[in-house]
């Protein structure tokens, strides 16, 4: 822990929890060097139970690539304030990392699983050192980019933070395997939800794969309209009508390479961030929406099969008709964590 400052967001939350804006040390997944990361920690008010408050480290979904897109810089934590309320009411300490490069100077290595995983683990460490009533028991929950982050954290936790008692991760609509997206370069078959993410995806991946040149792939209104480009690469502000309009001007055939090597470089970049990286240190819930148009449930299932082959304990749930980051998945994820904290044996359908 490098620093913390009081954080007050809403009267109803202030009544049940104490908030902290934190800066803490973590590790780069690409270089192995120390990094500074920001985030938030909330602890329940009152006396902790005898065994201490368990900790939940949250991996947030895609918010953007710039410092101002950090969860900790938004008064509603970019929508995560509701989750903080829910979890602290259960008597849990909550930590939300901003991830490396968000909230602090420097590029954000978007979807780099090792960096995100280290950030999630170290947020739990920071919470434990900051909150006197916390226990060493912790779990993780995340969705989309955050689901990838918490899955990676589950794999890293045992060796990276052996002093903590990791009980599992709930990975919701995780960006665990996007390699199929490379097969659509130039063929015009991207779904609208995938189109909306392509500027962020290509630009973010280029941080750790410099040979991937976003300008070789991004054409049409992205290239021709500076205002659209700024909106598409800006913070993801929910249902922002201006950004939605810019997305509406994208066309599937706007995304294609200009050199023979471009598609292969993109494919390698996506393969590099695919999970699993190795066996997990604890059980996992993996939830996917059967109608998810951004991250196909079949892609997630392929990653689960590989994790099962490594000996992981995984409960996979595919919800028919549900889309990306469905509220039902979040409800199931929170209950799954409650069961792990209660010592109930984790289910598996590997």
Name the predicted role of every residue range.
Residues 57-59, 99, 319:
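Alpha/beta-hydrolase
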Residues 258-268, 294, 301-350:
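C-terminal catalytic histidine-bearing segment of alpha/beta-hydrolase fold enzymes
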Residues 1-48:
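Catalytic-loop region of hydrolases
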Residues 9, 175-276:
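Accessory cap/linker subdomain of secreted extracellular hydrolases
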């Amino acid at each position: 822990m490098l620093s913390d400052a009081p954080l007050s967001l809403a009267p109803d939350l202030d009544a049940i929890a104490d908030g902290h804006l934190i800066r803490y040390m973590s590790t780069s997944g690409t270089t192995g060097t120390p990094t500074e990361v920001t985030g938030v920690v909330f602890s329940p008010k009152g006396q902790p139970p005898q065994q201490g408050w368990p900790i939940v480290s949250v991996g947030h979904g895609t918010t953007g690539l710039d410092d101002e897109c950090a969860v900790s810089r938004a008064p509603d934590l970019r929508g995560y304030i509701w989750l903080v309320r829910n979890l602290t009411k259960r008597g849990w300490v909550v930590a939300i990392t901003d991830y490396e490069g968000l909230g602090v100077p420097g590029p954000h290595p978007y979807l780099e699983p090792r960096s995100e995983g280290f950030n999630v683990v170290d947020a739990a460490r920071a919470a434990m050192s900051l909150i006197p009533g916390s226990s060493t028991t912790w779990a993780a929950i995340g969705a989309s980019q955050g689901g990838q982050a918490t899955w990676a954290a589950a794999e890293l936790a045992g060796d990276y933070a052996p002093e903590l008692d990791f009980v599992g991760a709930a990975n919701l609509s995780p960006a665990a395997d996007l390699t199929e997206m490379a097969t659509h370069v130039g063929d015009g078959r991207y779904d609208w939800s995938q189109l909306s993410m392509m500027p962020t995806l290509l630009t973010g991946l280029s941080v750790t794969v410099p040979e991937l040149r976003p300008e070789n792939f991004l054409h049409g209104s992205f290239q021709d309209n500076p205002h659209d480009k700024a909106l598409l690469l800006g913070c993801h502000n929910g249902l922002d009508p201006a950004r939605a309009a810019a997305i509406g001007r994208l066309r599937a055939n706007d995304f294609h390479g200009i050199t023979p090597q471009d598609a292969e470089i993109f494919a390698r970049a996506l393969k590099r961030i695919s999970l699993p990286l190795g066996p997990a240190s604890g059980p996992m819930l993996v939830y996917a929406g059967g109608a998810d148009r951004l991250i196909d449930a079949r892609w997630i299932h392929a990653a689960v099969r590989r994790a099962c082959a490594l000996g992981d304990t995984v409960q996979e749930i595919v919800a028919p008709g549900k889309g990306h980051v469905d509220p039902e998945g979040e409800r199931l994820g929170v209950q799954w964590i409650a069961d792990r904290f209660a010592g109930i044996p984790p289910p598996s359908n590997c």
